[in-house]
């Protein structure tokens, strides 16, 4: 079998492409960031070959343009990812992700005694990175958690 096979993911006309997601994080990102709530077509590539990562995940959301703030929230789970905004099959904007200072309305607080569970407020976490470890501090109960604990509580 000397025939070389190439994996192809269909191009989109307009929308957002989240590329260079670490393999295994694509499904988590779809769920945590409510990308499955859209009625637009979503194309997901899992464990695709990548020169830089070995393997990667990829998400394409048609007719949806992620803002820089939305894109930066992805940096918690995919710090090396890029978000490309596509118009008429061309990349018009490329967001290099930066860890945001705050994340609002994405995760629930893991502290069951937090007032955010009983009051009609959006969750709100301050984000800090110390010596490579990312921690999220709840605005309401002021408890601090690792990103893994917060995403599991989701």
From Swiss-Prot:
Regions annotated as coiled coil: none
Transmembrane feature ranges: none
Needed cofactors, names only, are: Zn(2+)
A single Pfam family it belongs to is: PyrI_C
Q: List positions binding Zn(2+).
A: 109, 114, 138, 141
How, per the record, is the cofactor bound? Binds 1 zinc ion per subunit.
GO terms in the biological process aspect are:
'de novo' pyrimidine nucleobase biosynthetic process; pyrimidine nucleotide biosynthetic process
Q: Which UniProt keywords apply?
A: Metal-binding, Pyrimidine biosynthesis, Zinc
A Gene Ontology CC term for this entry? aspartate carbamoyltransferase complex
Q: Which GO terms describe its molecular function?
A: metal ion binding
InterPro entries in the cross-refs? Asp_carbamoyltransf_reg_N, Asp_carbamoylTrfase_reg, Asp_carbamoyltrfase_reg_C, Asp_carbatrfase_reg_C_sf, Asp_carbatrfase_reg_N_sf
* Family membership: Belongs to the PyrI family.
- How does the annotation summarize its subunit structure? Contains catalytic and regulatory chains.
What does this gene product do? Involved in allosteric regulation of aspartate carbamoyltransferase.
HAMAP family from the xrefs? Asp_carb_tr_reg
What is this protein's name? Answer: Aspartate carbamoyltransferase regulatory chain
């Amino acid at each position: 079998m000397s025939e070389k096979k190439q994996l192809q993911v269909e191009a989109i006309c307009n929308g957002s492409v989240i590329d260079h997601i670490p393999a295994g994080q694509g499904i988590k990102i779809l769920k945590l960031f409510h990308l499955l709530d859209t009625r637009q077509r979503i194309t997901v590539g899992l464990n695709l070959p990548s020169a830089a990562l070995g393997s990667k995940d990829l998400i394409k959301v048609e007719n949806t343009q992620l803002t820089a703030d939305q894109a930066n929230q992805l940096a918690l789970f995919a710090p090396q990812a890029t978000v490309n905004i596509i118009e008429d099959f061309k990349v018009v904007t490329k967001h290099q992700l930066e860890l945001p200072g705050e994340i609002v309305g994405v995760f629930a607080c893991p502290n069951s005694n937090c007032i955010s569970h009983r009051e009609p407020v959006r969750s709100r976490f301050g984000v800090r990175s110390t010596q490579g470890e990312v921690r999220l501090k709840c605005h309401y109960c002021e408890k601090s958690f690792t990103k893994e604990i917060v995403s599991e509580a989701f």
